[in-house]
């Protein structure tokens, strides 16, 4: 009788262990894949956004537009994460005098969003994080959406100013989306932000 109980206990213990192991394995597998796809798109954005290499502007190259000030890394474990994880992915400073809307020294923030299918939805909590970060001396916040993947880059890319996606009241921290806009209507409205030349993503005049 005692042996039967012991065997049952061992079977139950092994069953629970296997379940938790597989559940944990699946979680980290999905997290690793999701992070890989996100990181791959971020790297692609950096390489295609007229940013000077090594962080120094080469003013002899007329295509150089930005200096990369910061590139956030999403590092966290079991609820521990740095405050920097609340900031957008990229922080860039204008280094050209040829812009009509940016001056040398102007800083913009860029959040990269890769998805397998077209969709411009944003998580409310993410918006709140990024907008609180925008209380700093940053001129604009942009969302770079990448959809699909073919070869060494996304199939389509949109560079969308935050205010084209929602309004944000800094005093009340209220987020307002366009009223009664369907996803199809949103896609049609944002079509003008689709990039035709993916080699010069953030060449914003």
Kindly give the residue locations of the regions a language model identified:
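Short loop/turn segments at strand-loop or loop-helix junctions that form parts
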Residues: 67-73, 111-114, 146-148
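Conserved catalytic cores of phosphodiester-cleaving nucleases, focusing on short active-site segments
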Residues: 49, 90-94, 100-116
């Amino acid at each position: 009788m005692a042996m039967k109980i012991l065997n049952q206990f061992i079977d139950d213990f092994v069953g629970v262990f296997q379940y938790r192991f597989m559940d944990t394995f699946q979680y980290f597998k999905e997290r690793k894949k999701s992070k890989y796809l996100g990181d791959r798109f971020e790297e692609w954005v950096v390489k295609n956004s007229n940013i000077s290499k090594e962080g120094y502007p080469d003013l002899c190259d007329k295509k150089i537009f930005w200096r990369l000030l910061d590139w956030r890394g999403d590092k966290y474990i079991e609820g521990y994460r740095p405050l920097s994880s609340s900031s957008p992915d990229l922080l860039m400073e204008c280094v050209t005098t040829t812009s009509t809307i940016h001056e040398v020294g102007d800083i913009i923030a860029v959040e990269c969003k890769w998805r397998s299918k077209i969709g411009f939805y944003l998580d409310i909590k993410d918006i709140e994080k990024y907008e609180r970060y925008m209380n700093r001396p940053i001129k604009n916040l942009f969302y770079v959406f990448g959809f699909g993947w073919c070869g060494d880059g996304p199939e389509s890319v949109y560079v969308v100013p935050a205010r084209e996606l929602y309004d944000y009241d800094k005093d009340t921290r209220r987020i307002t989306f366009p009223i009664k806009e369907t996803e199809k209507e949103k896609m049609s409205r944002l079509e003008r932000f689709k990039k035709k030349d993916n080699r010069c993503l953030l060449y914003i005049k």
